[in-house]
């Protein structure tokens, strides 16, 4: 596995934009299927189990992660770890389920979620059609979950105290990370004086294509960095195309998302929709994308719609589109952004921005015809529901989504900008 440096920091840039004409369809992507065909359930008990047993009842449970990794699991099977117990090492999932019958890893019994700690990655998925749920993955040297396969679903986990909560490698595609708690993943994998190579502190790292990150809570992706002072991101995309980051609540991360790619690769067509982004960090930033003038760009056809952002730090930023920004680099619609510093930055021809609400000390971009600079009237610092009289009400245009972050219907006309529809 290659750990890619982030090559930051983008503070208050002056660079050039690329003209964006984004026609990306904004319909929510489908999740990887969950298993529908019944198979065998195997139990794992760290205290009373034995790998020599059948594993098919709690009384005959297996004991170790290695036993699970070596088992000939089939489509529709389930591996259940006993609640209140912990394992050290890597759970290796190399077999594959099918589109109609995933292999499931979960929990049984009562008490706290089963814990896996230590190891390079606490869970490593190289197979396809797995569902991993209800585990806590903590203190891993790299990732809570690393996915190299396809059509896998990670749901209902807690990943904390790792370099990255969930990492999807360059071979990983059509995976879903959903309804999980990715908390205080605040370790750096590279952190040394000089240069421009520090890396780490990610909630989710996407090096693959066509993945969905949705309905998660991502907090505390933040760490000290020799190169940048501080670093970290809720969702980092590097060499990943057509990923969808939607319906997430994020708090106190250094950056919500930053995009880049290696020479000869791409990070195109990524969509950010209906996310709530709050942070008290001084340099917190919502979104960073690059044009062709950057060695990490261009990040073509990036789309940000209906995000609500509140970053009160004096040097906090909304969106940054630099080194040749243009309408085919970044399209923004229906975003509500309040920051202590600059709300948006563009150079070059400029981003395709409209129907937004902005509040901040600086606005270094051309405001769209239906955008406005005004107080968004959020309910609170982290509760970004709009209050009565908010300029976001009725400002939004259709963006292809039928419900908001609360699951409330989005009307075909007169929608509220931001992640939440106004509810009188």
Model-derived regions, located:
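Secretory targeting and sorting signals
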Residues: 2-33
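Detector for repetitive beta-architecture
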Residues: 41, 76-78, 84, 90, ...
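Acidic Gly/Asp/Thr-rich repetitive segments characteristic of extracellular carbohydrate-active
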Residues: 46-82, 86-87, 406, 410-411, ...
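Right-handed parallel beta-helix/beta-spiral solenoid domain characteristic of secreted/periplasmic
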Residues: 78-89, 93-143, 179, 369-376
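Extracellular beta-strand/beta-solenoid scaffold signature
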Residues: 92, 117-123, 139-146, 161-169, ...
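Predominantly extracellular beta-rich ligand-binding scaffolds that present long acidic/polar faces
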Residues: 94, 244-250, 269-383
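Consensus "Asn ladder" position of solenoid repeat domains
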Residues: 135, 152, 157, 175, ...
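Surface beta-loop-beta hairpin patches that serve as ligand-binding interfaces in beta-rich domains
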Residues: 390-424
């Amino acid at each position: 596995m290659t750990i890619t440096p982030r090559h930051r920091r983008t503070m208050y840039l002056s660079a050039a934009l690329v003209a964006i004409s984004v026609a990306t369809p904004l319909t929510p992507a489908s999740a990887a299927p969950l298993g529908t065909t019944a198979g065998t359930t195997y139990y794992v008990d760290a205290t009373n189990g034995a790998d020599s047993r059948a594993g098919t009842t709690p009384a005959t449970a297996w004991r170790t992660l290695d036993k699970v990794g070596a088992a000939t699991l089939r489509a529709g099977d389930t591996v259940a770890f006993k609640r209140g117990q912990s394992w050290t090492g890597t759970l290796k999932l190399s077999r594959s389920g099918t589109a109609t019958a995933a292999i499931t890893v979960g929990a049984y019994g009562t008490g706290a979620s089963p814990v896996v700690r230590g190891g390079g990655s606490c869970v490593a998925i190289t197979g396809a059609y797995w569902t991993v749920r209800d585990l806590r993955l903590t203190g891993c040297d790299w990732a809570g979950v690393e996915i190299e396969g396809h059509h896998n679903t990670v749901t209902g986990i807690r990943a904390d105290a790792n370099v990255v909560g969930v990492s999807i490698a360059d071979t990983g595609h059509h995976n879903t990370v959903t309804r999980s708690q990715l908390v205080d993943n605040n370790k750096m994998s590279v952190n040394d004086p000089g240069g421009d190579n520090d890396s780490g502190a990610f909630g989710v790292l996407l090096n693959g294509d066509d993945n969905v990150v949705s309905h998660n809570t991502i907090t505390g992706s933040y760490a000290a960095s020799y190169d940048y002072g501080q670093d970290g991101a809720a969702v980092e995309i590097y060499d990943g195309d057509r990923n969808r980051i939607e319906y997430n609540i994020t708090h106190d991360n250094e950056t919500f998302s930053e995009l880049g790619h290696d020479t000869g690769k791409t990070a195109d067509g990524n969509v950010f929709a209906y996310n709530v982004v709050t942070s008290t960090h001084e340099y917190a930033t919502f979104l960073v994308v690059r044009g062709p003038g950057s060695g990490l760009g261009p990040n073509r056809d990036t789309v940000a719609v209906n995000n609500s952002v509140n970053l009160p730090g004096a040097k906090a930023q909304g969106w940054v589109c630099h080194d040749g920004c243009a309408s085919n680099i970044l399209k923004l619609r229906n975003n509500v952004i309040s920051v202590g510093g600059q709300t948006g930055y563009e150079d070059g021809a400029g981003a395709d921005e409209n129907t937004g609400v902005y509040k901040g000390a600086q606005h270094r971009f051309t405001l769209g015809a239906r955008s406005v600079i005004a107080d968004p009237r959020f309910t609170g610092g982290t509760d970004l529901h709009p209050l009565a009289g908010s300029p976001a009400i009725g400002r939004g245009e259709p963006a292809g989504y039928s419900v908001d972050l609360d699951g409330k219907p989005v009307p075909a006309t007169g929608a509220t900008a931001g992640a939440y529809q106004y509810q009188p």
